[in-house]
């Protein structure tokens, strides 16, 4: 860190590792380092070192290629970290997945009709992802397949494109097909987790 851009140009005592914890943002595209005094450093989802914003640090002054000062944005970032910790606590709770599943399936039952087959396409990796089949009916000569679980986690990188992400951050995907359902459903094994694997979002 350049001397002019740190609060401790002569160095400071080593941090106690037992007092440090990393908190990932819900989207998975940012992380905060927290100690007993609060935020120590944050690399948010909109940080891009190549564009001159490497992240924020409590010990930084002004802006440098290594870190921007955290003091001026602490009020904006701290609620995000609090939300993130609450989100991961919720995700670890035993009923979290069931609540997402129940909400999505109830919506599909009301809007499309009764379910058929149900597949796990997450391969054991988060976020948990299922596919629900709605077989053809007398008035609908095609099958509707829908993901179940994507909406349980916000998609990454929306903060780079819009100020209010609330209407775009959570999605489920669906398709209509006349192909055998178990063949068509395979696309969701790849595309369902794509936003978190590729650190992007659907809706560009």
Show the residue positions of the predicted features.
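Short linear motifs embedded in intrinsically disordered, proline/glycine-rich low-complexity segments
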Residues: 1-204
